[in-house]
């Protein structure tokens, strides 16, 4: 399957724990917890089979520590797991461990690291351990937990994307429901601004200090729901084509030109945006399922708010809102105790563990059988982020490094300065496809057209 790089970003599991979870790239905020945190038990007899599990996650460290201790105390195979919680140095430490004899037995993998770890040879396939029941229970996701027909991890939780809106400001403006089209988005932002401007409230904002982050949680998901690849890649033709973004970027520009966008978005980062929203100064923005935890803990909301599906270009859903995730634990290729390591992994993937994981608010399950029985976490606003029939996992697109300005920067420049958007898009298509051709010729990147690709078929796998 063609490759596409999934954005990592904050997710519910980050925010609900009041800390960013990081396997290095894209998820900062962790500090190393010494050299490790061993949870030991006294089960079994004779010499222990000692294995280690390395993770960069801090948000769920206490939960995982409890489960490690439970496994150590209850397993009858004499296996003892040491939990090692790293911080921002996770990737570097893992690289160094594979150059020595200190590599872990089990590795925390994410959508933004599993491909790299696979290519570096850090991971061992787990197919020999998978029963037919496990294969049916845990979805296979090519390029996310499956490579060249072999499984390297199983899913646990995922991240959804939604429109976050200020219900109080909506009521003040007399607006009954969130926008479902781009034109409604523009009109709603204008009405919200008219109702709130006297109090310093504006209809719309995104964290445009980083155009990639801002558009990656807004324009991207609007495009995906409308049937276009969220990063400009067309899976049917195996070429880059940003033309689907034209109405989206024009709508954002119109909101700014109307004066409906919070002043100063050019320098607005995500946390200052959240702080403003919590105070009631923003009517709408788009983001990940991290937001409920943020407004419970980091920036307690002083307003009534909710989340809804993002609008599409014309009100018709022709694709799927990206559901990010698909992996959790990986088996180290250097482990000398792979069977013991798998028994620990199998324990962590038991229904009760995964159900507890969601119900305690660490993440939204991507395992259908768990989603069907797990209770909704007691966190205000989370219900709007739970999987719906329009959430789906997009294939991975090929990573390229175009010369010149990246697409997000080019789009934001147009939003600020105007110009010819069609010409901007034509230039992006030319440069991105040149970079793609170079990557195919020189770097072994694969990009094959799939004329039968149907973005609408991606949804409906996690909820009906």
Question: What do the PLM-derived regions correspond to, one by one?
Answer:
Residues 7, 22-114, 177, 340, ...:
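Conserved N-terminal structural module of periplasmic/extracytoplasmic solute-binding proteins
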Residues 62-63, 123, 290-296, 327-402, ...:
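Mature extracytoplasmic/periplasmic domains
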Residues 70, 74-139, 146, 168-180, ...:
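Extracytoplasmic "Venus flytrap"/periplasmic binding protein-like
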Residues 73-74, 149, 173, 258-260, ...:
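Extracytoplasmic/periplasmic substrate-recognition and gating elements
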Residues 110-161, 196-197, 202, 215-217, ...:
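Hinge/lid segment of periplasmic solute-binding proteins
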Residues 144-145, 301, 305-310, 359-415, ...:
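Long, aromatic- and glycine/proline-rich binding clefts that accommodate carbohydrate-like moieties
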Residues 148, 152-156, 161, 186-238, ...:
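Extracytoplasmic/periplasmic solute-binding protein
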Residues 189-190, 235-265, 310-313:
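Glycine-centered hinge/linker elements that transmit conformational signals in sensory
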